[in-house]
Swiss-Prot record:
Residues 151-193 are annotated as: Domain III. This is Holliday junction branch migration complex subunit RuvA. Keywords: Cytoplasm, DNA damage, DNA recombination, DNA repair, DNA-binding. Has three domains with a flexible linker between the domains II and III and assumes an 'L' shape. Domain III is highly mobile and contacts RuvB. The keyword DNA-binding applies. InterPro entries: DNA_helicase_Holl-junc_RuvA_I, Hlx-hairpin-Hlx_DNA-bd_motif, NA-bd_OB-fold, RuvA, RuvA_2-like, RuvA_C, RuvA_C_sf. It holds the Pfam family RuvA_N. One of its GO terms (molecular function) is ATP binding.
Length: 193
């Protein structure tokens, strides 16, 4: 397995790259989040990679962060989700945004990505639950979600509310609200239905 490639960036044409590593040119596909952070052609580049061996091809996918690569690995484990769709997901949203969408069960955020329909989005939410560090606030480099929001969510779950109900109620709690006040506001939102 090829886990990392470092060399000179020879070509970049979204989402494809050609990286020269000691005279060997590696074709690598990357998500747009990685593509936008690449240096200019002719510069040195280092990418974490995932190699996929198929009957008709050996394919390399490159990532700027370990979190992106791990998320890609989780995505391609899902039945019906291939590397092309996994790259589309990572191109359409950050790892942190995906983790939040999974935690809050927001299929609508996923359906905005080309190639992801309602059924595929629902399958992604189901299969990724608990596999991305998807608890609120646990994805490094993403938008911070306070520990208080996580505590409020956990309290609602402990009270017997479903993940979806709790996630919807959390959206009604303003950022920076303390735990006890957050629970009160979330319960009020749940009682309104």
């Amino acid at each position: 397995m090829i886990g990392r490639i470092a060399g000179t960036l020879i070509e970049k044409n979204p989402p494809h790259l050609l990286v020269d590593c000691h005279g060997v040119g590696y074709e690598i596909d990357v998500p747009m989040s990685t593509f936008y952070n690449l240096p200019a052609t002719g510069e040195k580049v280092a990418l974490l990679t995932q190699q996929i061996v198929r009957e008709d091809a050996h394919l390399l996918y490159g990532f700027g962060t370990a979190a992106e690569r791990e998320t890609f690995r989780q995505l391609i484990k899902i039945s019906g989700i291939g590397a092309r769709i996994a790259l589309a997901v990572l191109s359409g949203m950050s790892v942190a945004e995906l983790a939040q969408a999974v935690t809050l069960q927001e299929a609508g955020r996923l359906t905005r990505i080309p190639g992801i329909g309602k059924k595929t989005a629902e399958r992604l939410l189901l299969e990724l639950k608990g596999k991305l560090g998807a608890d609120l606030g646990t994805v490094p480099g993403g938008p911070a979600v306070s520990d208080d929001a996580v505590d409020v969510l956990n309290a609602l779950l402990a009270l017997g509310y479903s993940d979806k109900e709790a996630a919807q109620a959390i959206k009604q709690v303003p950022a920076g609200t303390g735990v006890s006040e957050g629970i009160k506001l979330a319960l009020k939102a749940l009682s309104k239905g």
